[in-house]
Amino acid sequence: IPAVMSGDVDCVIAGQSITAERAAQVDFSNPYYYASIVTLTKKDSAYANAASVADLAGATATSQLGTIWYDTCLPQIENANILPAQETAPAMLVALNSGACDIVVTDRPTAQAALVAYPDFTLLDFGGGDNDFKVSEEDINIGISMKKGNTALQSAINEVLSTMTADDYNAMMDDAISVQPLSE
């Protein structure tokens, strides 16, 4: 956001949730993606068969700094030992792989790439509803940020986004996952 506000970049496409706090600083496109919350653990973990957030009770957990996964989701785990937030997704995954934590909560694309890099991890998807983490639409709607008042850029981006289908977005996400460093 600071790079957008200073004019160093025109826009940022980086999995940013469109929150009221962020929208006070920058403008956003319409949402282009809705994040899915998942949990990663090791296949031999006591939590590997968890079917709900309640099943994660007592876990040592972490996630990435500045994310809803850390700020909103982890506190919902009863009696969790919440470690400090990790600076990056790779650091979060190293914490899990090294045994520093039992679980990490993240988004599906990060988790899917991690499964390629760490075959001893397993992905837990609680499928929404009562078994899942409780988040608002604001927490999971992802948009493109741009400098406040740049209505021409906002309109142009929204016009392009309006031509795309959910299948288009999912195909692009799959392509991005396949080429990111975690999946190599």
Predicted regions and their residues:
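Proline/Glycine/Serine-rich low-complexity intrinsically disordered segments
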Residues: I1-E184
